[in-house]
A protein has these predicted regions:
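Alpha-helical bundle segments enriched in helix-capping/polar residues
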Residues: 1-173
Length: 173
């Protein structure tokens, strides 16, 4: 298919955008030329293009992840994937800043500032989060003191009960 021939995208988001572009082609000559200028710059600036492709290769499907989060269906792995993708934004901004065509600089200016969210996820989500919420352990140790205390109680429940039993025996003897 034409999509198969043209699709050199590195992300699921890019593949969806390419498909949309093919299904709804531009009609304005100015917009077509602007897009072609962007493609030409990407083609000619191979070092910048390869760097951009490497960075984009690290970005997960943020649109899908956002949908899962908004519907309450996100897993700890999804949150970890979002965290890693948001952590790539500074690199993506840097890579895009090397381009001059308006369509590419427009992408740069359209990137949202989500540094606070990235920071929150980095401090809250544990590395190598489990696949399911029910497995627990996806909140980073040290993020919440009360949670850490509860984890400690769970991990040391047997010794806590034994100590309590000993104290009660001593008290009642």
């Amino acid at each position: 298919s034409l999509l198969w021939v043209l699709d050199q995208t590195k992300t699921a988001m890019g593949a969806r955008l390419m498909r949309q572009w093919l299904l709804s082609p531009l009609k304005s000559e100015d917009k077509i030329n602007a897009r072609l200028n962007g493609v030409e710059e990407l083609y000619n600036a191979s070092v910048l293009r390869v760097g951009l492709q490497e960075t984009l290769g690290e970005v997960k499907d943020v649109g899908r992840l956002a949908g899962k989060i908004s519907y309450g269906n996100a897993t700890p792995k999804d949150l970890e994937a979002l965290k890693k993708s948001l952590e790539m934004l500074p690199s993506l901004r840097f890579r895009l800043s090397g381009f001059a065509s308006p369509i590419l600089t427009g992408l740069l200016s359209s990137l949202p500032n989500v540094d606070d969210l990235a920071s929150l996820l980095s401090s809250a989500i544990a590395e190598n989060a489990p696949a399911l919420v029910k497995d627990g352990g996806y909140i980073r140790e040290g993020y919440d003191a009360e949670l850490d205390e509860l984890r400690g109680m769970r991990e040391h429940a047997a010794s806590l009960l034994k100590d309590m039993e000993t104290r009660e025996k001593d008290r009642t003897d």
